[in-house]
Amino acid sequence: MPELPEVETVRRSLERTVSGKTISSVKVFHPKMIRGMEVAPFVDALKQERIERVERRGKFLLFTFDRFYLVSHLRMEGKYFPYPQAIEKDKHTHVIFRFTDGSELHYNDVRKFGTMELREKETAMSVPPLAQLEREPFDPTFTAEVLAENLIRKKRSPIKTSLLDQSIFLGLGNIYVDETLFAARVHPLTKAGALTLDDISRIHAAGVDVLAKAVESGGSTIRSYVSPTGKGEFQLQLAVYGQTGAPCPRCGTAIEKIKVGGRGTHFCPTCQQVAL
């Protein structure tokens, strides 16, 4: 699933390619992707509307119009591809936005899990799913103290599963939680309630740093992720994720993989000790 760095990379690409364009028509080939209304009113609402800019909240893309947002979640395999002119859709293209200049934006999704929803600007941030999100990790008001307060309600849960909650630490997914905990030297099975403020401070600093570096590298291309402009490169810097059996870059111990909350989890058994 694309995490914050991948979604931010997609956002930046879309901002360059579709911001300022006016939609002339929309074709929806998989109606279940459209949430909150039927396909017909969704299509009608977007006709002749101009994309002012493309924003992001956590892992959600927000196409900004005059009165509303188009809130898009890529889920597992969602991708956007801009084209300078109309082209024939492939079998995995489920939504096509046609612009008044003749260009198109195709939404492609092999798994068909992605969603699109129109939300009024006045209420979008105060109702789910956007209302449930923590502030952006790069927001200076998101401090280690805020993270510590958030973790209080997860004190009996492993820190790995706690950090996957977008109301705890926005933007982290399976890849970047593993990398964050390795950088912070915290075992993924450590209960959130067993962490010291120093532990939480290291997790906070590591999480923000990992996400920032991943954004700079265009995200991580693991399996099928690509942005509209190509593949990410942060996978070349991953210390533990996907490195089962490889030597730890700090101590040389073989990286191990376990299941935590049903998610494959990578860690160094020497550098990351369980706090009881």
Swiss-Prot record:
It comes from the Bacteria. Its EC number is 3.2.2.23, 4.2.99.18. It catalyses: Hydrolysis of DNA containing ring-opened 7-methylguanine residues, releasing 2,6-diamino-4-hydroxy-5-(N-methyl)formamidopyrimidine; 2'-deoxyribonucleotide-(2'-deoxyribose 5'-phosphate)-2'-deoxyribonucleotide-DNA = a 3'-end 2'-deoxyribonucleotide-(2,3-dehydro-2,3-deoxyribose 5'-phosphate)-DNA + a 5'-end 5'-phospho-2'-deoxyribonucleoside-DNA + H(+). One of its GO terms (biological process) is base-excision repair. The active site is at residues 2-3, 59, 263. The keyword Ubl conjugation does not apply. SMART domains: Fapy_DNA_glyco (SM00898), H2TH (SM01232). Its cofactor is Zn(2+). GO terms for molecular function: 8-oxo-7,8-dihydroguanine DNA N-glycosylase activity; class I DNA-(apurinic or apyrimidinic site) endonuclease activity; damaged DNA binding; zinc ion binding. InterPro entries: DNA_glyclase/AP_lyase_DNA-bd, DNA_glyclase_Znf_dom_DNA_BS, Formamido-pyr_DNA_Glyclase, FPG_cat, MutM-like_N-ter, Ribosomal_uS13-like_H2TH, Znf_DNA_glyclase/AP_lyase, Znf_FPG/IleRS. A zinc finger (FPG-type) spans 239-273. Binds 1 zinc ion per subunit. Keywords: DNA damage, DNA repair, DNA-binding, Glycosidase, Hydrolase, Lyase, Metal-binding, Multifunctional enzyme, Zinc, Zinc-finger. Signal peptide: none annotated. DNA binds at residues 92, 111, 155. SUPFAM superfamilies: Glucocorticoid receptor-like (DNA-binding domain) (SSF57716), N-terminal domain of MutM-like DNA repair proteins (SSF81624), S13-like H2TH domain (SSF46946). PANTHER family: FORMAMIDOPYRIMIDINE-DNA GLYCOSYLASE. Monomer. Involved in base excision repair of DNA damaged by oxidation or by mutagenic agents. Acts as a DNA glycosylase that recognizes and removes damaged bases. Has a preference for oxidized purines, such as 7,8-dihydro-8-oxoguanine (8-oxoG). Has AP (apurinic/apyrimidinic) lyase activity and introduces nicks in the DNA strand. Cleaves the DNA backbone by beta-delta elimination to generate a single-strand break at the site of the removed base with both 3'- and 5'-phosphates. Belongs to the FPG family. NCBIfam families: fpg, PRK01103.1. This is Formamidopyrimidine-DNA glycosylase. The lineage of its organism: Bacteria, Bacillati, Bacillota, Bacilli, Bacillales.
